[in-house]
UniProtKB/Swiss-Prot annotation:
Membrane spanning stretches: none
Any one GO molecular-function label of the UniProt entry: L-malate dehydrogenase (quinone) activity
Keyword Flavoprotein part of the UniProt annotation: yes
Protein name: Probable malate:quinone oxidoreductase
Enzyme Commission (EC) number: 1.1.5.4
Family membership: Belongs to the MQO family.
Superkingdom in the source lineage: Bacteria
Keywords per UniProt: FAD, Flavoprotein, Oxidoreductase, Tricarboxylic acid cycle
Any one Pfam family match given in the protein's UniProt record, by short name: Mqo
Organism (species): Neisseria meningitidis serogroup A / serotype 4A (strain DSM 15465 / Z2491)
Keyword Hydrolase applies: no
Pathway: Carbohydrate metabolism; tricarboxylic acid cycle; oxaloacetate from (S)-malate (quinone route): step 1/1
Cofactor list: FAD
Length: 488
């Protein structure tokens, strides 16, 4: 007998948690069930050690504003990401202010920087600064080529550096470090207190649609072969990170045809020596190597995890065919069907430089990887650093009318035409834009309810519907308010 519920959220990460809280705030009477394959929430990509936790707001990530062919830098994409992050930040602040999250310990003030180290990159960074400084959301950004000034911002990165090496840096004091694992756990704890059912160690075996439009999920208990649970729901969200593609394919919706995925794993060096970690307080992004994918931009980060400061450097790209860190090596081969084979082959052919880059990364020794860290931290001691494996990122491959298939960096909502099912595919910027992504998903799936939700949404997100960059006075008010509530 199927257990009926209004909403099923598959995946115990930041996306499901965010959508769950939004729906519970907007429709308190709806019954919600969250399913997670592992024994707790936030153990895959939302875990603090499986993501960069940058609080992506485009302050330091250079790949969001590349140099155009005309020599001009367009800040539009960076502004869009910054606007999205501020929507998330407002939502989190409201939940803290209303006592719905335990505290604000999931977010910390950590300056964001960009650091580049050759003449061409220094010239680019100057142009980027010139393009950004006139924008409200980037007005406090600083730029310098003065080595002493840069040393004040990031002393470890300048100590021992060649005096003749050109360097330039951007610095934004308003950057943050977000522990998405802690945030997810706080959100789910709130949901549990509101009656949301959480089913752990549950693997989704099958997804079928009934004649009345309801979705039926058959799940198995990963610890007990006899522990079957069947759920029946009128709205299904597939927010299982890299595992969402497999679930989307199981659903059989026509909108999911032609989608494939390319998994990329990430390695980081982690330093937990408090003496070293206390000397660096910034997230510092560099410039990606030629042919490197966007998620491989090198960065040296201050990370605050469970109240302790660490340093992380990476990522180093790797390849494993599983879609989740704790997934199966058969995930990729089993995801290849007749409808996505051609797009995947075409995308693979068009991205040979990426393939060559990944092969080169895979061949690197630990010493070769450490040499990259020394470019950013010249006096780094190998004994202080351990190499860790972060989460899997599954990049989207989709049909393209002109190219046959394209590899897409970013996130994408794939929803049934009637709004009864939605899946979130892709990766970066990911968690930092969870709130606007889930609001957009709700608008797409529940268009008839959107008008009645507007009032509460404006309470949850005070700047809802407003572009902060275009409303300076309102931006000042909202940014000051969220900074105060979140203690950043």
């Amino acid at each position: 007998m199927a257990e009926a519920t209004d909403v099923v959220l598959v995946g115990g990460g930041i996306m499901s948690a965010t959508l769950g809280v939004l729906l519970k705030e907007l429709e308190p009477s709806w019954e919600i069930t969250l399913i997670e394959r592992l024994e707790d929430v936030a153990l895959e990509s939302s875990n603090a050690w499986n993501n960069a936790g940058t609080g992506h707001s485009a302050l330091c990530e250079l790949n969001y504003a590349p140099l155009g062919a005309n020599g001009i830098i367009d800040p539009a994409r960076a502004l869009n990401i910054a606007e999205q992050f501020h929507v998330s930040r407002q939502f989190w602040a409201t939940l803290v202010a209303e006592g719905k999250l335990e505290d604000n310990s999931f977010i910390n003030a950590v300056p964001h920087m960009s650091l580049v180290m050759n003449e061409d990159h220094c010239s680019y960074l100057q142009k980027r600064y010139d393009a950004f400084k006139t924008q409200k959301l980037f007005e406090n950004m600083e730029f310098s080529t003065d080595r002493n000034k840069i040393s004040d911002w990031a002393p470890l990165m300048m100590r021992g550096r060649d005096e003749n090496q050109p360097v330039a840096a951007n610095y934004s004091a308003e950057g943050t470090d977000v522990d998405f694992g802690r945030l997810t756990r706080q959100m789910v704890k709130y949901l549990q207190g509101k009656g949301v059912k959480t089913e752990f160690n549950r693997h989704v075996e099958d997804i079928k649609r009934e004649s009345d439009g309801a979705w039926v999920l058959k799940t198995a208990d990963t610890r007990n072969p006899d522990g079957q649970l069947t759920l029946r729901t009128r709205f299904l969200f597939l927010g299982a990170g890299g595992g969402a593609l497999t679930l989307l394919q199981k659903s059989g919706i026509p909108e999911g045809k032609g989608y494939g995925g390319f998994p990329v794993s990430g390695l980081f060096f982690r330093n937990s020596n408090p003496e070293t970690a206390e000397q660096h307080n910034a997230k510092v992004y560099g410039q990606a190597s030629v042919g490197a994918p966007p998620m491989s931009v090198p960065h040296l980060d201050t990370r605050n995890v469970d109240g302790k400061r660490h340093l992380m450097f990476g990522p180093y790209a790797g390849f494993r065919s599983n879609f989740l860190k704790q997934g199966s090596l058969m995930d990729l081969p089993l995801s290849i069907h007749m409808d996505n084979l051609y797009p995947m082959l075409r995308a693979g052919w068009a991205n040979m430089p990426l393939t060559k880059y990944l092969l080169g990364e895979l061949r690197k020794t630990k010493e070769e990887r450490f040499a990259s860290l020394l470019e950013y931290y010249p006096e780094a001691n190998p004994d202080d650093w351990e190499l860790i494996t972060a989460g899997q990122r599954v990049q989207i491959i989709k049909k393209d009318s002109e190219k046959g298939g394209v590899l897409q960096f970013g996130t994408e909502i794939v929803a049934h035409a009637d709004g009864s099912l939605a899946a979130l595919l892709g990766a970066s910027p990911g968690a930092s834009t969870a709130v606007p992504l889930m609001i957009r998903l709700m608008h797409q799936c529940f268009p008839e309810r959107t008008p009645s939700w507007e009032g509460r949404l404006k309470e949850l997100v005070p700047g809802y519907g407003i572009k902060l960059n275009e409303n300076p006075e309102r931006a000042d008010e909202i940014i000051a308010y969220t900074a105060k509530v979140l203690d950043i």
